[in-house]
Amino acid sequence: MQESIQLVIDSAPFLLKGAVFTLQLSIGGMFSGLVLGFILALMRMSPLWPVKWLARMYISIFRGTPLIAQLFMIYYGLPQFGIELDPIPAAMIGLSLNTAAYAAETLRAAIASIDKGQWEAAASIGMTPWQTMRRAILPQAARVALPPLSNSFISLVKDTSLAATIQVPELFRQAQLITSRTLEVFTMYLAASLIYWVMATVLSSLQNYFENQLNRQERDPK
């Protein structure tokens, strides 16, 4: 028992370094996914059926196939076509593309939940569709989308562990490397799991805090 505890203490710098990288990878993937997801959401709401169809196909493919398969196709598959990526860019692209598919549906639903009368009211005072979207619709849609997007981010933090399969040095990969040297399988994966749990708990608490702040603003606009 003491040896296991000492191993965790000795390995802590490597695990924490991996945890920091996990958060960086998650933030980068979430940000890029939100940008692409917003574009896809607008495409899904387009009156042009080819544009809408393309967005639907993208979302269907990336939501309907395993993330690990997507990572493998990007990292191991693209070199067959002369496109070679280092592990970190490959993971970032894969996580971003996958996140975008889920974010698109969340954002589309949030925008669609806003009363359509607000579009008409904005048009009546001379606002363009983009001005209406930016000034009236998006601020309200953001409040609706915050809880599911926060949950998606927490899931993304855990999903980054799949990047270990393409040699990305995030938390789970660090645990794998230490395990291969020490053969302490249970100890190291338990330590890594606890770090994931702490990160998820902290992020969940932050989510609840921001949701409560938004709810207070709705009840008391002043």
Regions found by a protein language model. Give the residues of each.
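Transmembrane alpha-helices and adjacent helix-loop boundaries
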Residues: 1-222
